[in-house]
Amino acid sequence: MYKILIVEDDETIRNGIKTLLELQGYYVDIAVNGVDGLKKFDETYSLVIMDIIMPLLSGIDACKKLREESSVPILFLTAKSSEIDIMQGFEVGGDDYLVKPFSNMELISRVKALLRRRNVYDREIIDDNAGNEYIDRKD
């Protein structure tokens, strides 16, 4: 079962996303800000969904700290919608960026896509550790 951490300071949004993802069969933990998210994070999470504008520690700063120790996919979910904001989200290590308000279908689609990419990455690591050889194909 996939384990997802939601880092969001708005209780209504946090609980709505939690319920939506649980109905899809995911195990979901919540954190109320960036500091809380960093305390709760461990490598058993398959995905982190994170707001950017939060008290104590922004999502941007929390992402920077997570990237020092982990490659877990991070989906920013935020009201910040300028091109500069989006670019900054990717530059600090975010894997996807969704602007509020968002549709439930779009969120679920992006979560599934990030988890599929994570599965491919994890399989490649396992295969590589098993000593399998890869052929680099250049089209």
Residue ranges and their predicted role:
Residues K3, A113-D139:
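Short, Lys/Arg-enriched segments at the junction into DNA-binding effector domains
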Residues E8:
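Conserved acidic carboxylate
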Residues E11-D29:
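Two-component/phosphorelay signaling modules centered on CheY-like receiver
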Residues I30-L47:
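Acidic, metal-coordinating helix/loop segments flanking the phosphotransfer/catalytic sites
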Residues N33-D36, S58-A62, D85:
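Acidic catalytic/metal-coordinating carboxylates
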Residues I52-P55, S81:
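Receiver (REC) domain active-site loop signature in two-component systems and cognate sites
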Residues S82, F102-L115:
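C-terminal output helix
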